[in-house]
Amino acid sequence: MAIWFARSKTLVSSLRHNLNLSTILIKRDYSHRPIFYTTSQLSSTAYLSPFGSLRHESTAVETQADHLVQQIDEVDAQELDFPGGKVGYTSEMKFIPESSSRRIPCYRVLDEDGRIIPDSDFIPVSEKLAVRMYEQMATLQVMDHIFYEAQRQGRISFYLTSVGEEAINIASAAALSPDDVVLPQYREPGVLLWRGFTLEEFANQCFGNKADYGKGRQMPIHYGSNRLNYFTISSPIATQLPQAAGVGYSLKMDKKNACTVTFIGDGGTSEGDFHAGLNFAAVMEAPVVFICRNNGWAISTHISEQFRSDGIVVKGQAYGIRSIRVDGNDALAVYSAVRSAREMAVTEQRPVLIEMMTYRVGHHSTSDDSTKYRAADEIQYWKMSRNPVNRFRKWVEDNGWWSEEDESKLRSNARKQLLQAIQAAEKWEKQPLTELFNDVYDVKPKNLEEQELGLKELVKKQPQDYPPGFHV
């Protein structure tokens, strides 16, 4: 690559000649564009061409040299023109404060009693949509409870709940288009549930049987569905963010009427991939909605030990990304914010960051005991007094769309369906152990063949170390 560029007169001319990017690498009008738009401006915004952006781009050195004197004469006396941007100057030495004196407010629509706050700005939700949202939130609660108990009974090896974050799961999913591509972390099964992933499919993945789309190779809760535009979950934290920027950019290049949506927790923002993903999406103006679940805890690490900034929302502005802080326990606020962000990302071809303020009621996973690092009273308070499902239910009931009879019937049916799904998943055979060595290379190399043979010999020598009915 370096040799190729060295042979070119300039980087720009090289790209133009070799990649046919003459329409991209042109001078831009760097005049100020408004950060915020009125409703009428947003509604009339045309679809932006992938190559019609206003972002700053490099120009040829020779072009800069030819017009240097002219540029200096034209620059306002109060501004300095640097390659990094045109900026004003001051004779006063003043450091930017580490934070604003006032914290960024949190957008909400419903109060704690499920009543709409007067003069709230939100997108109306129909009875049909509201009822479905609540049904899915309640089903997610039941699913989490039963799978968690199944792990405690030794029927599955691992589980991780979304207790306390049901509104973020379901309301955000409801605000998206089925064509939008989701790159999740590991606490968003509700998004997949909303899109049509069945309870049987959830159970098959958790049990790692032959019906599991991942062929039993992944640990439980690492779901994925190509059919539902839901990338398979990966364990490494934050790797999905740069990937989401790339997927979003590909949607932009293909002029798709869709965006990428990716999730991460507050702890994940300490990973380098968080910053790389945001910067990548901002520079390339990729239609990506970044949703951060700020639930206060990164396993046992409190947010006070994660960052000193005003949460996550302020990090978006640093990368040139529009951002908003939302009450993640308010389903109406989550729905309105995500739907608005989604429209902004698609119509304006830009990334958006949403910080969802919430609380992780459950343990980090079945491998964790959170009472060792936080008070039981604190957990109970958020479980009972700040429960997002109960809060949304009050609003649905106040509208006359839900009753106690509906509640009892829904939870009873969900429980029966889940128990049946678990029983069916247990009856499926497990994948043979040698399946581990397939789908890695087109032609299996000698070293893998040797490892496979060694594993077979080990199982033969020590069969007591493997469960009954285990297939090699």
Curated annotation (Swiss-Prot):
GO molecular function list: 3-methyl-2-oxobutanoate dehydrogenase (2-methylpropanoyl-transferring) activity; metal ion binding
Major localisation: mitochondrion
Keyword Oxidoreductase belongs to the record: yes
Expression triggers: By dark treatment. Down-regulated by sucrose in a hexokinase dependent manner. Up-regulated by Leucine and its derivative alpha-keto acid (KIC).
Catalyzed chemical reaction(s): N(6)-[(R)-lipoyl]-L-lysyl-[protein] + 3-methyl-2-oxobutanoate + H(+) = N(6)-[(R)-S(8)-2-methylpropanoyldihydrolipoyl]-L-lysyl-[protein] + CO2
Cofactor or coenzyme needed: thiamine diphosphate
Subcellular location, record wording: Mitochondrion matrix
Entry keyword set: Metal-binding, Mitochondrion, Oxidoreductase, Potassium, Thiamine pyrophosphate, Transit peptide
Alphabetical list of SUPFAM superfamilies matching this protein: Thiamin diphosphate-binding fold (THDP-binding) (SSF52518)
InterPro entries: Alpha-ketoacid_DH_E1_comp, DH_E1, THDP-binding
Binding site for K(+): S234, T239, Q240
Signal peptide interval: none
Residue range of the transit peptide in the UniProt record, numbered on this chain: 1-56
GO cellular component: mitochondrial matrix
EC top class named in words: oxidoreductase
GO biological process: branched-chain amino acid catabolic process; cellular response to sucrose starvation; response to absence of light; response to sucrose
EC number: 1.2.4.4
Record-listed thiamine diphosphate binding positions: Q185, Y186, R187
Miscellaneous: Bound potassium ions stabilize the protein structure.
Self-association and partners: Heterotetramer of alpha and beta chains.
Function: The branched-chain alpha-keto dehydrogenase complex catalyzes the overall conversion of alpha-keto acids to acyl-CoA and CO(2). It contains multiple copies of three enzymatic components: branched-chain alpha-keto acid decarboxylase (E1), lipoamide acyltransferase (E2) and lipoamide dehydrogenase (E3). Required during sugar starvation.
UniProt record similarity statement: Belongs to the BCKDHA family.
Name of the protein in its database record: 2-oxoisovalerate dehydrogenase subunit alpha 1, mitochondrial
Native source species: Arabidopsis thaliana (Mouse-ear cress)
